Amino acid sequence: MTIILGIDPGSRVTGYGLIRQQGRQLTYVASGCIRTVVDDMPTRLKLIYAGVSEIITQFKPDFFAIEQVFMAKNPDSALKLGQARGVAIVAAVNQDLEVFEYAARQVKQTVVGTGAAEKAQVQHMVRSLLKLSANPQADAADALAIAITHCHLSQNVLRMSEGRLNLARGRLK
């Protein structure tokens, strides 16, 4: 049994989602958002670090997966996102977790089937895959999708290393 923590970083709202993987079975553990309502960036970063550290201490995940930075239209937004990612990653590394990073398009492709999926589609698929009674908050759903992506992609790598991955014309069968 493995617990995966997925993080959808943001300077104002950082989503988190935890799932349990047992073989191919995925089970919902917890999810939510770390909200930073203060204006100054150093305090926001401190709150994100403390929140992620607390989640890691409470749930003791085996793996930490986080969304990669994408090129935003506004360079200032991209820098703030990078800082939020940085403190979340430091929180994980300080507790000896290996960090895995996934691009947003890769997460959407894995969970929804298209890299151009809308947030509502991600929420719907996360709800369906984890058998939830309601759609999770958008940022929490993204974090759960990141954790799901880690499970699926790490399973494929494991199967490849064991020589059990079936490929036809370069695609998974």
From Swiss-Prot:
It comes from Serratia proteamaculans (strain 568). Pfam families: RuvC. Mg(2+) 1 binds at D8, D139. The RuvA-RuvB-RuvC complex processes Holliday junction (HJ) DNA during genetic recombination and DNA repair. Endonuclease that resolves HJ intermediates. Cleaves cruciform DNA by making single-stranded nicks across the HJ at symmetrical positions within the homologous arms, yielding a 5'-phosphate and a 3'-hydroxyl group; requires a central core of homology in the junction. The consensus cleavage sequence is 5'-(A/T)TT(C/G)-3'. Cleavage occurs on the 3'-side of the TT dinucleotide at the point of strand exchange. Keywords: Cytoplasm, DNA damage, DNA recombination, DNA repair, DNA-binding, Endonuclease, Hydrolase, Magnesium, Metal-binding, Nuclease. This is Crossover junction endodeoxyribonuclease RuvC. Disulfide bonds: none annotated. The active site is at D8, E67, D139. Transmembrane segments: none annotated. Gene3D superfamilies: Ribonuclease H-like superfamily/Ribonuclease H.
